[in-house]
Structures are given as C-alpha cells and as structure tokens.
C-alpha cells in the first residue's frame, strides 16, 4: 500500500533513504559523511530510492 500523506512520506525519506552508501564496501553512512566509517574510502554515493514530488 503506497504512502500518500506528505508528512509520512518525508519521515520515510529521512529515516530510510537519506543515507550515503560506500561504493567500495557497501556500508551505510550518515548523509553528512565525507568518508566511509568502515573502510575510510571517500567514494560515497547517495542511497538510491524514490524521488519526492
């Protein structure tokens, strides 16, 4: 069942999708990270997910 409430959608985005993923080891990092917490690589990307309208 899709979530249509904009407030709940924002909560889901911040809780689930607002992260960075290390391209080297796959670890999840906070959105403000500049280096990976596990392998110290600087090769991070934002987590893929849906786009907010």
From Swiss-Prot:
Entry GO MF terms: structural constituent of ribosome
Signal peptide positions (record): none
Residue ranges of the TM segments: none
Keywords from the named record: Ribonucleoprotein, Ribosomal protein
GO biological process: translation
The keyword Ribonucleoprotein appears for this protein: yes
Keyword Thylakoid recorded: no
GO cellular component: a single term: ribonucleoprotein complex
One Pfam family, short name: Ribosomal_L40e
Similarity comment: family membership: Belongs to the eukaryotic ribosomal protein eL40 family.
PANTHER family: 50S RIBOSOMAL PROTEIN L40E (PTHR39649), LARGE RIBOSOMAL SUBUNIT PROTEIN EL40 (PTHR39649:SF1)
Protein name, UniProt field: Large ribosomal subunit protein eL40
Annotated gene: rpl40e
